[in-house]
Amino acid sequence: DSRLSRGLGDVYKRQTIDLNCFKVDTLLRAVNTDRGMMTVYTKTPIELIEDVYSTFEERLTNARTKLGRQLTYAEKVLINHLDSPNQPLERGSSYVDLRPDRVAMQDATAQMAWLQFMTAGLDKVAVPTTTHADHLIQAKVEGKHDLLTASKTNEEVYDFLESVCAKYGAGFWKPGSGIIHQVVLEQYAFPGGMIIGTDSHTPNGGGLGMIAIGVGGADAVDVMTGFPWNVRWPKLIGVHLKGSLNGWTAPKDVILKVAEILTVKGGTGAIVEYFGDGASNLSATGKATICNMGAEIGATTSIFPYDDSINRYLHSTDRSDVAELAKSNQEHLTADPEVLQSPEEYFDQVIEIDLDKLRPHINGPHTPDLAREVQELGAEAKSNGWPLKISAALIGSCTNSSYEDITRAASIAREAAKHGLKSKCRLLITPGSEQVRATITRDGLLADFEAVGAVVLANACGPCIGQWDRSEETNHETGTPNVIVTSYNRNFPKRNDGDPSTLAFVTSPETVMALALAGTVDFDPINGSLQTADGDQIALSTPEGIELPPSGFDPGEETFIAPPENATELEVKVSPTSDRLQLLEPFPAWDGNDYENLPILVKAKGKFTTDHISMAGPWLKYRGHLENISGNLYLGAVNAFEGYEVGYGKNLLTGETQTFPEIARSYHEANQPWVVIGDENMGEGSSREHAAMEPRFRLGLVAIARSFARIHETNLKKQGMLPLTFSDPADYDKIDESDRLSVRNLTGLSPGEKIIVDVTKSSGETFSFETTHTFSEDQIQWFKAGSALNVIRSQTQS
């Protein structure tokens, strides 16, 4: 019953797709491989979805019998994608093999994923795969200018991605096509399906009832090479939504409230499943917003059941065949009735939120779970000495750039313009996709923003991921705090603009618009008033949103490149002198010995996110060059030992104070392996596997933390490192800068067994502490082979 691949029955077909009166003759390409059949084109073929739905009935019936109970919706989708239906399903304990329907990758993480895939020795990808050029476009002037600049600056990388997609049978969405998650929602997501993507906000697809999970590039390579994806069977958190949103309250406020309740690590190892009448009252794109930002609570993914709003969105995005097919399978695309009647019996945790009572929220700074209602921010800012003045307001990102989001914010801008009001700070708008941009341009919504002084950026991630050049606005040297408000998802220090003094707050697009008009965080959009040029005071009206464009979506410019019919002879060139791309050498296998006398490269205090470990922003250009990107290793880490600036520590070989990447390079050149120590939730944030590949490249062998974020822990395992968790979190405090660590009994590494770490202090005194790990039997083979990719390579080339 293996799901090695799902596709069309014949080799080549041509289908005409009607995109709201815009006819696109799209090549559907089905590629025969020794592992099955796959298809790449601009939408998910109905045949693939029919195949997925065809196994629901039998699999779910058998699962109910096996488990002796009814099923939640998330369980239904996962069970239907099991490689083998006979695997043990113990929440938070057993590991399972899954067969995702497709893979999506963004251009920053895709480089390393493709470089890894190229070493596997296969001619084609085994499942439908797409690469989306959205991360490498830096915002500076405005959309067209920035896109042209990016096309020149990143020409080598774009050429590589386009050619590697062509050679191996994948689709390529060109720069300007839009943010990966918005494009996936518009083109590929479908209820009951499963996708993995090399970006942590892949769960955006849960808004259409899809299991959509962010992974590292090595995980994607597993699936692209035809292997199942191995993951721990998740726990389940149920969120019961009651009532309806009203007034200024938006879907964004739901997830901001959930983040407050669960915190940034409360969802770790769990899928969050939303249900209830309140869930049905949300639009599909509103659902996507909530699922998208579920990454900020550490959740494996989030999901909503199929309902009428999802049906409407599918029809509006020219997928009526998918909508009708989903409707006819609706019983499988929602939780069983008994689950909805007694959710406490089926979920590990249940949260209830009354949407009628929910009020607009704004979270931050520096962490997405520091929440309060919008009207409370002014007083809190004053008490903390934060600036009240807003330096920039930003609307968009993969979290909040749907048509409905834009219409609600634009209604505020339109009203303000009628009274002669302008934004009192820099206002930047990011359309989520070319389709959204073309549609909101046609419908006059971008003009509404421009009337109050907004600048429209490229259809890309931009400032949300640090691709924002605002060097003329801020001075990193002075350390002068400044405040920005965004409709984004993350607000870690330096995340958006590289400035550690920037205080970033996340909220809904309409609240961002209101605060931009006020120019201060000390403003209540609901009860406050704004002064016009004539001295009159006006209160802002309640935002008015339109769920879907009445005239349909305008697809805009064609930005998809399908792979050619036969490109196996195509050569993917990587210059040996390139500073952007570098072919990979396999990491060495474990030598069979314990790790002895390892120095500590860094012991990090507090947040130790992937942004702290491997910064984005200006470093994004090196994402395809492992040696060069390693120049940012741990630059954002706060040293737990006193007397150091951020990103600095002591080189124990020389006694010098250096940056962490300088120390790592020194240890590498001296062939000195080392260990890294983390605090709580190490690796929180993005899916970037560079945060695991860089330390491995520089001879990092072990990472020990009080706890790990899911994706980062998996990425460390994939690259052959040993992530260990303190059995007693207090042992973290016992480790000193000059200590040497030895990891014992690695020959006995097995699931569930504790690992002993011996510590030798500079005085000669020794002590030991226990650690736990989450390795499965299969994952232990990754460790022994040196990486998961080494295991794949040995099997594909045998």
What are the language-model segments listed below?
Residues 275-280, 489, 665-708:
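Extracellular/luminal Protease-associated
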Residues 148-152, 156-157, 162-197, 273-276, ...:
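Accessory "access/gating" subregions that flank catalytic or transport cores
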Residues 42-47, 57-62, 68, 77-83, ...:
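Flexible inter-domain linker/hinge segments
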Residues 41-44, 191-323, 421, 460-463, ...:
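Mobile "lid/hinge" segments at catalytic clefts and subdomain interfaces of large enzymes
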Residues 49, 56, 61-234, 624-673, ...:
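Long, structured ligand/cofactor-binding scaffold of large enzymes
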Residues 530-547, 713-782, 789-792, 797:
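Acidic, glycine-rich flexible loop/linker segments
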Residues 1-15:
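Single conserved hydrophobic/aromatic residue that forms the stacking wall/gate
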